[in-house]
Each structure stands twice: as structure tokens, then as C-alpha cells.
Amino acid sequence: MAERGRLGLPGAPGALNTPVPMNLFATWEVDGSSPSCVPRLCSLTLKKLVVFKELEKELISVVIAVKMQGSKRILRSHEIVLPPSGQVETDLALTFSLQYPHFLKREGNKLQIMLQRRKRYKNRTILGYKTLAAGSISMAEVMQHPSEGGQVLSLCSSIKEAPVKAAEIWIASLSSQPIDHEDSTMQAGPKAKSTDNYSEEEYESFSSEQEASDDAVQGQDLDEDDFDVGKPKKQRRSIVRTTSMTRQQNFKQKVVALLRRFKVSDEVLDSEQDPAEHIPEAEEDLDLLYDTLDMEHPSDSGPDMEDDDSVLSTPKPKLRPYFEGLSHSSSQTEIGSIHSARSHKEPPSPADVPEKTRSLGGRQPSDSVSDTVALGVPGPREHPGQPEDSPEAEASTLDVFTERLPPSGRITKTESLVIPSTRSEGKQAGRRGRSTSLKERQAARPQNERANSLDNERCPDARSQLQIPRKTVYDQLNHILISDDQLPENIILVNTSDWQGQFLSDVLQRHTLPVVCTCSPADVQAAFSTIVSRIQRYCNCNSQPPTPVKIAVAGAQHYLSAILRLFVEQLSHKTPDWLGYMRFLVIPLGSHPVARYLGSVDYRYNNFFQDLAWRDLFNKLEAQSAVQDTPDIVSRITQYIAGANCAHQLPIAEAMLTYKQKSPDEESSQKFIPFVGVVKVGIVEPSSATSGDSDDAAPSGSGTLSSTPPSASPAAKEASPTPPSSPSVSGGLSSPSQGVGAELMGLQVDYWTAAQPADRKRDAEKKDLPVTKNTLKCTFRSLQVSRLPSSGEAAATPTMSMTVVTKEKNKKVMFLPKKAKDKDVESKSQCIEGISRLICTARQQQNMLRVLIDGVECSDVKFFQLAAQWSSHVKHFPICIFGHSKATF
């Protein structure tokens, strides 16, 4: 059935990096399935295994097991010896090839990769295996986008509890190919005679007999059921039950396909036929036979298009494409061909936009496709004549999210965040401009995409697996990172998903600066991972530590947040020395609280990037028409990169979000997100809130809190249920939608204030530092928590500050342990300093929260907790400034 090696690697840790090449394959009869099932061949190549934590006490070795969801047959690798610590990073050379039934009319075509160990009883090995960690890949996505460039699959140690990322497997290639019918028919051998007589019980017994050679006892490895998200057993049985009539129909279709396959080509006939023979008559007879068989037993997939196609591709219905904008590629399509799709072309420069287009609210040609759907934000007509970031506008609004985001009409190319749909029919374009109902969206949305969305799966990297970096990113990186022996002094990462980044990248590229244009989370992850790997190669080739590489981050606050999460994730697995190998420079484009803070501690930075000319240039699209009158953009950026040599250590705080469960049987999931800036809170009432995976959203200008919240693109609902040492990095790059109007929120906020330095000296004799817990349980107009240090703050204790605006209840509510508010005041704003920990939840449990963390929105949050310090050794984000010098006014 399968060829499996039971080779144990040498026990010495040094031998772990010597891969043992192994090919494991299995061919199983899958013709006993329903007509909506296509036998396909899954080819998987693994190149590296990384175990981050100890999977079990006294664990000696593990095996890598591969199986299809719902199948009892498993392919296992050799045993991989683990060191005493349980953590290992070893190269692999494993190739798995297994035949599986691909179901077209239901979900569940998932490839499961597991880490297992042999079962033990009283220190004695028994038959069977126990699953320690598992991860899954949707084969439907693999068929749409075969992975030839490699990907990383996270293995979680548990699914019933909060998933914990325990290991990673690096996949070199993964593809799904059709199998020729005649091959599987010949392999079936004598079993073909009894195919028509299969019953449900015979199929079950046949499965258990082969399973006996693998796991010895049917159903003994109950631990694997915890990781199987398949159908109930009765449903699985009904799927494989077929009638003899259907089998006869399939058999005759095979005969037709077989006759077509052995049809002699015209070239051979021309070279071998005798002139006296009448070949056309024979061809007519064959065609008549084909037509007769097709008429008696018609296929549900229509007529055959080409004779040289695979037999499996014609009699079966086609899979509905996930993303219609991409070309329908076969299993052998290379990733590079995807870059030719329209959505992955480099966005046009705003300078190329005609003046007529700019006058219409600054819309670029792609805005009609991108802004109202991907972000759910209104067009410029819904915000007539309101200036961006003007002091009057900020002072006149008391929004739940007080920061103004860039105008919706200027957010372009957001369809490149997730591989998009590029339907260009007039009817579709017309429907996208309005708010469609939830039922229409659910009906128009592919079922597999809904089932595999981040909100449904709660899997760490589910959404990032659907994204592929553009080839342009790698080309730009290869042009900058020339050799392993020498690192560049600086690299500029620009967010080109909006018009500000597109304009800046065009200006910088004309001056041949080291620019990398990123317009999706996959682009950012690819760029940052490549930089880290090049630094690692440099360290491997040189004994001296590298000079810190300056990485300029040009974008809004949410773009810096994406870089921060990658920084925390990558360096949490590195030694503390790595904290000095990179320095970051903040080039603000749009709303940026961190840039405003840097301007408060460095007057030269403030003059460069916080003056009115810079803000107008990147907040008003019309300002680019007079770009020759604006300050020299390139000069400011080059002076900042060259002169900013002082590393300002920005403290990293931790946000733990607890999401609501998707079903009553499912438990809530937790996600850890690092942040350095501001966290803002909104609330969503259940009467109007849509499901977490819905795109239906009301315009942000509605001004009613009870309306459906504007939802960002699916990639913007980032973060994964991972521990603080390895947060997710799938944060979206598009600006999240504006919060709804300043409505009232019934919240309960518990916070702990840390002792001040003076108090600590006084209480130095006490073992436990004094920590005071306070509770706010009232109606809020707004709630904002900032981790940015106070201006001029030295190395103080890690604390946060909270700004709240509360509303009186009966004009006698008590705000903190203070006297009652004046009766003529309805609301009051107060800033609370020195908070070390904070927990916020809605007073009514059915209400869900919307949390904006460093500009990235997270929805469907039951409650969240903020801590002033990130829990791993990566506690600071190094940002370059000119020096700690305030402006003199």
C-alpha cells in the first residue's frame, strides 16, 4: 500500500541537520466514491521542521504524518530524534505522494499534516500513534494556486482549547494533479469485477482491513479525532455509498474516454494509411459510437472540448474558482504566472491621473472597484467639503475612533490585499456601488471561501496562505540585496496600496533610492523575511556582527503596525543580539500617532515630517499638481536616513483579544497583538451586527452606532491565536474604515495602576509592589488607551495612559473616587496615567466590541486585555531619530 521508512536519525544533535531523502507514496482505490468525486494525486515536498516548544515531557522522537481529512489511511515519515529540550530545527527531504478523492460539491478537501509519536503503555511501546500537533491545508486552494515557491504551515498543539503554535513545517512544493482513469483501473486489478456490488458495510470493512496494517486497531488512535474537522460518521458513510446504476454510467464514460484516448492522430494516419483505404468511413463509425454512448448516458459536464485533455477533466463538473480575476491555471502553473493578472500590476502613479479625474473627488480609475467594497467606506460625495486632518474637523467630532483616516476616495488599489475578484461587467460594477443585503452577499460568495475565511477557521495563517507576494517585490529586493557578504545601509519599504505611497514610490524611484513597493500583507511578509534571512546569511559568513540596517517604513500607522508584528514574530525566535541588527525610520503618510510623538521629542523630525507642507502634500491629492512648489521630498527623506543615528527605544505593549465563539460548541479564541501606539474602542449591538465573515457594511457616515460596522478587507481582520512569542503577521495594509459616530457605549473597564518611582522607594522594603485596582462601569462616549510615553519621560516604569469621555447617568454618577460632577455638565473627559494592565468588556454580554489597534480594526471581540509590556524578550521597537531635543516655542 505504501512505502514507509522507519529510520531513526542519529541521536547526536549535530546530525539533525542532515536530511534523509525519502519518497513516500500510496495508491488507493477511490473509484468507490460518489460521482461528484474526482481522484487526484497530491504531491507534497517538505524541506524543514521547526519545533518551538516542548510537545511532551520526555519526548524522544516524532514522526511526520500526512493524511486527507476523513480518510483513515496515513502516510508517516521516519522517526525524527528530538534533543532533550524538545525544540529542534532540522532540514527535511521528504516527498509524499498520495491519491485522494477530491469532492466537488462539498467542503473538506483538506490535507492534514501532523506531528505524532508512538503510543506507550507503562514505558512500553504499543500499536498506534498519538497526535501532538496538527495543521491543515485546503486542497481546493492548492488547485487554484499551486505552491511552487514554498510556504510555511503552522502546527497547533490543540484545537479544542485555545490553539497554540507549537511547530512549523516548511513546504517546498505542493500540488494536486489529475490521475488518468486507465492507470487507476489497471491498478485496481481484480477488484474491478466486484465494484458494482460494493455496499456500505463492505466499504467500511475494506477500509479497516487496510488500516490494520497502519494503526493496528481500528479507531484506537482517538487523539487524531480531535484534529479532524470532518463530517459526522453517518454523513461520511453516505458520501461513499453509490448505486450500481451510477457505476455503470461511470464505466461507460470511461470506455468513451478510453476510445478517444487511443484514437490515432491524423499525422500517423497520413504517414501509414494505404491510398485505397477509406479512413473517413471508419472515423464516422467511431464518431457515431461516441454520440450513441453519450446520448444513452449523458455526462453532466457537457461535450468534450479537446481530445488531449485529461480524462478526469471532462466528465466531472468544474470547481468554481475562488478568485475570478485570476486565470484558471492548472496544477503545474508557476506562481510567476499569477503576477500577470490585472490586480497584481503595479498601481499607476497619481501623477498619471488626468486632471478631470482628480477634480471628481480625487478618484483614480480603480476606485470604483476598490474603495466601496474592500473597505466599506463611502465615496467623497458622502463627506462633502470636509477638509482632511483639519483642527476644526477633529475638534468638532467626538467619534468612537477620534483619528480621521484618509478620505475614502483616495484609498486605491485595495483589491490587491487579498487575491481579488476583477469582474468588470457593468451589472456587477453597478451593484458594487450600493450596499447589498447579507443574503445576496452570502449567495454570491463562494462557499469554500466562506468556510476558509479567517473568522471561520480561527487558524493562525489561514488568510496569509491565500496571498502570494508579487514578483516585483522579489525583483526589487534582489536589486538591493546584492550579496551575502555585504548588507545595504538602508531599505525603504513603501505601502503602495494607497495613493500616497504610489506617489512617494514614483518620486523615490526616479532618484534610484532602494525602494521596495508593497501593497499586500504577503508583500510585506516576503520583504521582511527576505531581509532577515539576508542578515542571517551575513552572520553565518562573518564573525563580526553586522552594522544595523536602517529600514524606512513609509505609510500610515497601520502599515507600521504590520512591520511591528513581523519584527516581534521574527525576532522572538532569535537571540537578543538580533535586537541591534535593525533600526526603523518612520516616514508618515496620513494619520500617524507615532510620528506625532516622535515630533514631540525631536524637533528636527518635527520640522521634516510634521509641518503643514508635508501634511498637505500627503493628505490632499490636489496638492500633487503643484509638486514643484512643495518641499523637496527626496531631500527630506535622504537627510533623515543619513542623519538619524540615535535609536529611540519605543516600548511594545501587548493586546490580548478574546473573540466570540462561532457556534455554541466552540470555545472562544484568543489572539495576542503587539502595539506601540493607540488602542481605540467601539461597540456593536447584536440586533444589527452581521456575522464576522460578512462583508455587508453600512457607510461610516451613517452616524448611528447601532448600524452595521464598516468592515475592512478580510486581510485587515488580522492577528492569529498565537502566544506572545509568535504573533500573527497577516495584518492588512489598507486603512481600516472610519468608526461610526460618537455614540454611547456601556462598558466596564478594570485597570491596575502601577506604583510611581517615588512610591517604590518608599515601599522598597515591601516584597510586593503596591498595585491599585480601579473599575469604571458607566456609559462612555469614547475610550482610548495609549502606550506612547509622555513627552520628556525618561526610563520610567512600563505604563499606559487612558483617555475617557463619560456621560452622566441622572447627572449624579460618580466618576472615580471623586465628588459628583456638576449638574450642568453632561460629559467629562479625563486622562488616567500609570496604568499597567487594563481589561475592557461590554456591560451587556451580547454586545461585541470593535477594537482599533494601531490603525488596524478587529471585530467580534468579547473583551480584551492590555498589558504595558510585551511578554517576550522583544520589548522595544528601535526607531531612529536625530536626537532627543524638543522644539523651542
Curated annotation (Swiss-Prot):
Pfam families in the record, alphabetically?
A: C2_PACS_N, Pacs-1
What is one term from the GO cellular component aspect held by the record? mitochondrion
Name the keywords, alphabetized. Answer: Apoptosis, Disease variant, Endoplasmic reticulum, Epilepsy, Host-virus interaction, Mitochondrion, Phosphoprotein
Q: Where is the composition biased (Low complexity)?
A: 687-720, 727-737
Segments carrying the region annotation (Disordered) are 180-246, 293-463, 687-740
Where Phosphoserine occurs along the chain? 390, 416, 453, 691, 694
Listed Basic and acidic residues bias regions: 343-358
**Subunit structure, briefly?**
Interacts with BID and PKD2. Interacts with SIRT1. Interacts with HDAC1. Interacts with TRPV1. Interacts with WDR37.
Family assignment from sequence similarity: Belongs to the PACS family.
Q: What is this protein called?
A: Phosphofurin acidic cluster sorting protein 2
